[in-house]
């Protein structure tokens, strides 16, 4: 099937991003990836982007994402530093900056039908499949995406452009996501880059 004949769904991206470096003069951001996708003549992916500096702000925007008015933005992109099972929001020295899967599961309980969550963070997905499936069951989300390793910035940005773009050509369903996962592997010519990044897509059973 060629690009011209594939249906485009235009699944919007709701992106929350924290600071990557202590020096605020460093402009590093994932927004250029989203801007590129939004300006693509094929997909024109809509997106909402917010800078987040505190756990309080993070929870505020997380609740916004679950509202019906944002149903057209079913892809939640969380761009933060991470460790296994957690993301770090704001000053890592603060106890409340470590947002765990347990926290997210509690805040998003039953609110993620027909939605997916992408952790654009190091190692957050380096937990058991059993734990991820429990999260998916509790929240109703279709899938969790992210990394088990510490990916390089350029490689992950290039990969996420491909990943988010591919999601536009598949229904927001378990079967659609399985198709997207296989097509990403095919377009990368195998699984080597996926292994180097430690990428995984856990789809609800």
Enumerate the language-model features and the residues they cover.
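Caspase-like cysteine protease fold
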Residues: 97-107, 170-205
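A short acidic, often aromatic-flanked loop/helix-cap motif at beta-alpha or helix-coil junctions
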Residues: 53-59, 151-154, 202
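Short glycine-rich anion-binding loops that position phosphate/pyrophosphate groups of nucleotides
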Residues: 79-84, 124
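Short, small-residue alpha-helix embedded
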Residues: 157-169
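A domain-level signal for caspase-like cysteine endopeptidase catalytic cores
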Residues: 1-73, 81, 89-92, 114, ...
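Hydrophobic, Leu/Ile/Phe/Ala-enriched alpha-helical segments that form helix-helix packing faces
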Residues: 33-41, 62-69, 104-108, 135-136, ...
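Catalytic cores of nucleophile-dependent amide-cleaving enzymes
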Residues: 92-157
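A structural signal for short, well-ordered beta-strand segments and their strand-loop junctions
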Residues: 15, 77, 118, 144-146, ...
């Amino acid at each position: 099937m060629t690009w011209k004949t594939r249906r485009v769904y235009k699944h919007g991206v709701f992106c929350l991003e924290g600071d990557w470096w202590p020096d605020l003069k460093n402009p590093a951001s994932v927004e250029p990836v989203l801007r590129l996708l939004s300006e693509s003549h094929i997909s024109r992916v809509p997106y909402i982007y917010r800078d987040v500096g505190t756990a309080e702000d993070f929870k505020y925007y997380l609740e916004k994402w679950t509202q019906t008015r944002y149903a057209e933005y079913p892809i939640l992109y969380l761009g933060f530093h991470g460790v296994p099972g957690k993301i770090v929001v704001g000053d890592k020295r603060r106890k409340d900056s470590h947002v765990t899967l347990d926290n997210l599961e509690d805040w998003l309980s039953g609110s993620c039908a027909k939605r997916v969550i992408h952790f654009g963070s190091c190692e957050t997905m380096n937990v058991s499949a059993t734990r991820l499936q429990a999260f998916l069951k509790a929240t109703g989300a279709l899938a969790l995406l992210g990394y088990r390793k510490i990916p390089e910035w350029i490689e992950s940005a290039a990969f996420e452009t491909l990943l988010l773009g591919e999601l536009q050509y598949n229904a927001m369903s378990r079967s659609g996501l399985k198709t997207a996962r296989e097509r990403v592997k095919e377009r990368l010519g195998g699984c080597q880059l996926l292994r180097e990044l430690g990428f995984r897509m856990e789809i609800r059973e």
